[in-house]
Amino acid sequence: MITIVVIPTAHFSWTDTNFLNSVDYRLTSQPKIRDRFAVYAPGWLRRQLDEFSASLTASELLQALQTIPIPVKARCLLLPKPKRFAQWLLDVPSANIWHIPVTTLRATVASKHPSSDVYNYIPDHVPPSAEFDTVTRRVAAGRDIYVRSTKVLGAPLCLAAPAKYYAGYLSTHQLDGVYPDNWAPDNFHKREFCLTILPSLLGPRTFLLDVDADRDASYPLSVLWPQLRVLALKSRLLLPPVALLRRVVDPGLKPTWSADSDAAFRALRLSRPSSASKPTGFDFSALPVVDIICLFESEPDDHGRVAPGTRLTIHSVPTDLLTSLSIQEGVRYPLRQESGMFVPWVLLALLMSDDVTISGTRRSVKLETAHASARPFVHITVERCASARVVDVRGSPAMYANAVCLTLPKGSYKSTIIDTLPAMFSDLSILEQAAVIDSDALGDSLRPSFETQFLERLENLDPKLLDRAVASILSPASDTSDDAVTTVLDVFNALYREVMTPAQRSRLPLLTQQGRVLAFAHSDYELLSANIPIQVVRGSIPIDHVVNLLARRNRVGGTALQVLLDYCYRTQASPLAPTPAGRLYKQLFGPWLMVPRLSDPLIKLRLVASAPAKVLRAAGWTIDGDPPLEVSCLCAYVTDRAMAAALIERRLDSRALVNVGGDQLMFVEYAPPLPLVSIPRTFLLPVTYVVHWVSPQRVLLNGGNVSFTSGLEWTFDDDPQVVTSTGV
């Protein structure tokens, strides 16, 4: 059976028994078609949704309904009040399936103020104080659930005893919404298709009918249609109505087969059109990667002896990175610059990788990129490439199009990757520096800077205590309970809460709403403590960042202060396992590495919102002309104009809330958030992007702050650009 979730559209009648007609009139054209469908839209569900929608948010309600099976076989049996409950079991001994002692029942009946202790004999009953989703979690088992409240969600509510035992407990009106004790759900006859209004997408072969129409305002979950559609889109559970009609009504219909509905087409046993196998644009989400086995070698010692080289495997390096930089197998390359640091191409390979291991083992290692060891590596040879494969970089680790924050410790070469990779595309700005937020930018913006204030407070402590704290942190067997380390942490945390958290909170729009933002931070606590609503990726790199810190002697407070700062930030971080930062770097920069091998020029698109001229004029702005002003919220590039023209006709469920200041500083929010998986895979996205007017020359005079909401649509840019690679 294929289950199809239908969110009622406008003019839907709950009393209309012809449910199929409300989906599409062609489904009722022949009796034999109707026989292939079963409908699951119980009346008790409507009552429960109406009741809970007044006390819960739509998101909470939707989350609770996800675990409910179709059909619901369980019942919620409402127990009478303690005295009437005991009286019922005394009157009908066969109902005492819990074997409650008769003495307990008689004592409860005789008591003027009976307690609820008599219910303790009923295992797993749901008390009135239980969470609202307790019932929904138990419904899947299919067994009856005993409850003591009329407010239940997820199963029909029935009386556990005859109605006379509820006198004085339930009013006549309340009894109308409760089934009698002898009621049982109607037998549900499975058919080829089951249409349901229960928005649960977790069952096998369950899909969401993607009807492009306004929702029924009386249905409590209609406001969640965009969110539910995004959920189905991410899970590839969308079912186009034309596909269903082709399966049951007219085989001659030609639905468009797309990745968004691939699982639904397979469940319907529809054959893929022959034209669907033809390439339609370059897929920028499929990134080729490879593991490279490298030999790292040291210089000869004073006696001319050469130590054996060390073979390391750098995992999941973009193939196009090596191709663009003309890195060849079997060639011996210098590993270090005159400064002692690794050469840029090796740093890029390490930063964009998933891990570095000793070849032939699973032992991960961290490389020292600065001159730290007595005999550092000075040469590298790429011996061979192995395990060539393709990874999907569209939907993770960053999930949304607006902003993501990567947390890395100090000394993690964040500026290296931001400065070096864009240099490969000097003909086009693949990122906008204004939308790259450095981890030290906030502290440096304070007067005096955060590091300077921290140094001033440490200077009030005993110098020997600071030396002991640094030694304890750098010691292989570091003792973090040392009183010196604890003292430094207390000073840091107090100062951070005092000056950094309020400052972080004040720049919320800059982090999350100025377009497509890549922010860096030292720890996720920096964002969480300021309640910044941004996705945070806890990153790690295969480089020993502490050794890199020790090589930076020109920073505030010298290396000692940098080591203390790094340790304090790391103690703030949550204990969640980190994700290789290379996965995010591959997601953001990897698609651009494939550009040099394109044979077609890239055509630029814009994701635009419209600002009505009259709204701006009402806020004091002087605008040239009456047409709406377009706001460019995001851009993208494609290789096939005809393919793009078909894709951009798709309606976007997200809407834009745009705020424009009198200084023309613009911020945009998406409601619901715009997931990356909803953007076609043939769209090449910039690493970062800043919201701006498409035609700023139409703004003759700025006015006051103004906000407006708008739909979103993709449009072709008037000045398409050709992207070429110049190399590093």
Curated annotation (Swiss-Prot):
The UniProt record lists the keyword tRNA-binding: no
Localization: Virion; Host cytoplasm, Host cytoskeleton
Leader peptide range in chain numbering: none
GO molecular function, one term: structural molecule activity
CC terms in the record's Gene Ontology section: host cell cytoplasm; host cytoskeleton; viral outer capsid
Pfam families cross-referenced by the UniProt entry: Reovirus_Mu2
Alphabetized UniProt keyword annotations: Capsid protein, Host cytoplasm, Host cytoskeleton, Outer capsid protein, Virion
InterPro entries named among the record's database cross-references: Reovirus_Mu2
Main location: virion
Function: Minor inner capsid component. Displays NTPase and RNA 5'-triphosphatase (RTPase) activities. May function as a cofactor of polymerase. Associates with microtubules and plays a role in the formation, structural organization and morphology of viral inclusions, where the assembly of cores and the replication of viral RNA occur.
Family: Belongs to the reoviridae microtubule-associated protein family.
Name of the protein described by the UniProt record: Microtubule-associated protein VP5
Organism: Aquareovirus C (isolate Golden shiner/USA/GSRV/1977) (AQRV-C)
Lineage: Viruses, Riboviria, Orthornavirae, Duplornaviricota, Resentoviricetes
Gene giving rise to this polypeptide: S5
